[in-house]
Amino acid sequence: MRITYPSIDKLLDEVDSRYSLSVLAAKRAGELEAGKPGALDNYHNLKPVGQALEEIAAGKVTIDADPHGEADE
């Protein structure tokens, strides 16, 4: 399988590494499959992984640097 939309270059503009991209896409795809609402009005892809990648490319889904919400002192 080959990703054609969104392009890997566009995705890597939003996320700092391919590893981070794959983890973020997998987690978001899991949320979409579990029934969480999509962040976009229209999708080009029918499958949750493709939809997650579209959301990442659009800047709607990002990595939370501090998932526990603790401020650095």
UniProtKB/Swiss-Prot annotation:
E.C. code: 2.7.7.6
Catalysed reactions, as listed in the record: RNA(n) + a ribonucleoside 5'-triphosphate = RNA(n+1) + diphosphate
GO CC entries: DNA-directed RNA polymerase complex
Keywords: DNA-directed RNA polymerase, Nucleotidyltransferase, Transcription, Transferase
Organism, as annotated: Lactobacillus delbrueckii subsp. bulgaricus (strain ATCC 11842 / DSM 20081 / BCRC 10696 / JCM 1002 / NBRC 13953 / NCIMB 11778 / NCTC 12712 / WDCM 00102 / Lb 14)
Gene of this entry: rpoZ
Keyword Repressor: no
Subunit-level organization: The RNAP catalytic core consists of 2 alpha, 1 beta, 1 beta' and 1 omega subunit. When a sigma factor is associated with the core the holoenzyme is formed, which can initiate transcription.
One Pfam family of this chain: RNA_pol_Rpb6
Gene Ontology biological-process annotations: DNA-templated transcription
Lineage: Bacteria, Bacillati, Bacillota, Bacilli, Lactobacillales
Family to which the UniProt record says this protein belongs: Belongs to the RNA polymerase subunit omega family.
GO MF: DNA binding; DNA-directed RNA polymerase activity
Name of the molecule in the record: DNA-directed RNA polymerase subunit omega
Keyword Manganese on entry: no
Role description: Promotes RNA polymerase assembly. Latches the N- and C-terminal regions of the beta' subunit thereby facilitating its interaction with the beta and alpha subunits.
